[in-house]
Amino acid sequence: MVVIRLARGGSKKRPFFNIVATDSRNRRDGRFIERVGFYNPLATEGEEGLRLAQDRLAYWQGVGAQLSPTVARLVKQGAAKAAA
């Protein structure tokens, strides 16, 4: 099953997450099919904290990919921010 979830990057105490489409059996930071965005929880005012390729996200959901709970929350948050 394909899932869309966070893959941790960055250094110690400085998290950075790639939002990736991957097989559910792969490791968290292992091989992935496609990178569909990123999330930077420590972004400052001038930096972009969340970027999602909405077209690719819609494609993967259309072919049956499941969102992880955290990614679902981020998608909802990004949609609310885009609407505002």
Curated annotation (Swiss-Prot):
Does the keyword Signal feature in the UniProt annotation?
Answer: no
| Taxonomy, superkingdom | Bacteria
Give the source species. Cupriavidus necator (strain ATCC 17699 / DSM 428 / KCTC 22496 / NCIMB 10442 / H16 / Stanier 337) (Ralstonia eutropha)
Gene3D superfamilies documented for this protein? 3.30.1320.10
The UniProt record lists the keyword Ribosomal protein:
yes
Protein family per UniProt:
Belongs to the bacterial ribosomal protein bS16 family.
Tell me the InterPro entries matching this sequence: Ribosomal_bS16, Ribosomal_bS16_dom_sf
Query: What GO CC annotations are associated with the protein?
Result: cytoplasm; small ribosomal subunit
As one GO molecular function, the record gives:
structural constituent of ribosome
Q: Which terms are listed as keywords in the entry?
A: Ribonucleoprotein, Ribosomal protein
Question: What is the protein named?
Answer: Small ribosomal subunit protein bS16
S-S bridge residues: none
Any one GO biological process: translation
